[in-house]
């Protein structure tokens, strides 16, 4: 019988096959060692276990008792984190100052609220930026394609204009379409029309690229989704405040700031020394 030994030299796995005395060794040696695939192009077997280990290490950063929390360990003792925040849910940093998630039913409810708002915020942030950027740099997306001014066109009895094409949608049709399409989809989700085990992360037809087929990768994607969603919610709040204060969209605000960082920033707007004085 042959036994297999593994060694490493300069980071390259080396496989040696030891031949026992009963397998007719050479006369010059009682046993023979044969180097197998020293310079083989085939990936070594431990590579898969290494990838699994890296994924497990990454999961440990975001789930479980040793996950990252909202303050460093030196500033927050983990014993101060509420027991119901045990790291089983994506995005759990141990932060619930108002105790909103003490009751399990409330925890599930607020988790759903946050995730749905996060998804809408990510779509909304893209919808605020992309049309205005396209319009500013060459495309014809309407008179200004600024998010709050586009909606005002419908209030004035106008129709929408995208890439130079008029879309015959007035205010009534826009409201009806929103209520029917969005409200219908939300009702279908609440009543579990497709009978999914996880209403918040259904997968299946809602994951056409199969990004979350691997459970561990799916868990990491949940973390990325909620982190980006929270950032998008703050971005939307910033867009609202910018529009109220400056009367401009986020792309125009950014362009003016980049063209003159010291003349167009938060301090100059508050002080009223910028060209666009605040309307507060």
Swiss-Prot record:
A single GO molecular function term of this UniProt record: chlorophyll binding
Keywords annotated in UniProt: Chlorophyll, Chloroplast, Chromophore, Magnesium, Membrane, Metal-binding, Phosphoprotein, Photosynthesis, Photosystem I, Photosystem II, Plastid, Thylakoid, Transit peptide, Transmembrane, Transmembrane helix
Residues the entry annotates as binding chlorophyll a 4: 228
Pfam families hit by this protein: Chloroa_b-bind
Residues that hold chlorophyll b 1 according to the record: 70
Residues annotated to bind chlorophyll a 6: 257
Positions of chlorophyll a 5 binding: 224, 242
Processing after translation: Photoregulated by reversible phosphorylation of its threonine residues.
Annotated binding of chlorophyll b 2, by residue: 119, 167
Binding annotation for chlorophyll a 3: 225
Binding positions (chlorophyll b 3): 186
TM helices/strands, residue ranges: 110-130, 167-187, 231-251
GO annotation terms (biological process): nonphotochemical quenching; photosynthesis; photosynthesis, light harvesting; photosystem II assembly
Transit peptide: 1-48
Record membrane topology: Multi-pass membrane protein
Domain notes: The N-terminus of the protein extends into the stroma where it is involved with adhesion of granal membranes and post-translational modifications; both are believed to mediate the distribution of excitation energy between photosystems I and II.
Subunit structure: Forms heterotrimers with LHCB3. The LHC complex consists of chlorophyll a-b binding proteins.
Name under which the protein is recorded: Chlorophyll a-b binding protein CP26, chloroplastic
Organism: Arabidopsis thaliana (Mouse-ear cress)
Lineage: Eukaryota, Viridiplantae, Streptophyta, Embryophyta, Tracheophyta
Gene encoding the protein: LHCB5
